[in-house]
């Protein structure tokens, strides 16, 4: 990539990819990745930590947990409005 520095046109391809600043930046990038990875594994309760709600105002303090999903209904979708579908065998509906 071409860039301008102090009024001169420079090409970054001339610089070695193994210069000291690249190696140190790469090391700190890996170190930060590892730190953030383990922070996300160990700190699952982000909402309480950020002040979205404490343990005193939680609705599920007695260990019950939130309610489960409702049972799944099988069959046709009956809550949509519109014409009924044609018969499975086809035809013109006479």
Curated annotation (Swiss-Prot):
UniProt GO molecular function: identical protein binding
Its membrane topology: Single-pass membrane protein
Keyword annotations: Calcium, Calcium transport, Cell membrane, Endoplasmic reticulum, Ion transport, Membrane, Selenocysteine, Transmembrane, Transmembrane helix, Transport, Ubl conjugation
Keyword rRNA processing among record annotations: no
Transmembrane segments: 20-42
Any Gene Ontology CC annotation: endoplasmic reticulum
Positions marked as site (Cleavage): 81-82
Modifications made to the protein after synthesis: Cleaved by CAPN2/m-calpain in resting macrophages but not in activated macrophages. Macrophage activation up-regulates expression of the calpain inhibitor CAST/calpastatin, resulting in inhibition of CAPN2 activity. Truncated SELENOK proteins produced by failed UGA/Sec decoding are ubiquitinated by the CRL2(KLHDC2) complex, which recognizes the diglycine (Gly-Gly) at the C-terminus of truncated SELENOK proteins.
Region (Disordered): 48-94
GO BP term, example: response to oxidative stress
Subcellular location: Endoplasmic reticulum membrane; Cell membrane
Main location (coarse class): endoplasmic reticulum
Role summary: Required for Ca(2+) flux in immune cells and plays a role in T-cell proliferation and in T-cell and neutrophil migration. Involved in endoplasmic reticulum-associated degradation (ERAD) of soluble glycosylated proteins. Required for palmitoylation and cell surface expression of CD36 and involved in macrophage uptake of low-density lipoprotein and in foam cell formation. Together with ZDHHC6, required for palmitoylation of ITPR1 in immune cells, leading to regulate ITPR1 stability and function. Plays a role in protection of cells from ER stress-induced apoptosis.
Family: Belongs to the selenoprotein K family.
Subunit relationships: Interacts with DERL1, DERL2, DERL3 and SELENOS. The SELENOK-SELENOS complex interacts with VCP. Interacts with ZDHHC6.
PANTHER family with a match to the protein in the record: SELENOPROTEIN K
Protein name: Selenoprotein K
Lineage of source species: Eukaryota, Metazoa, Chordata, Craniata, Vertebrata
Gene, per the UniProt record: Selenok
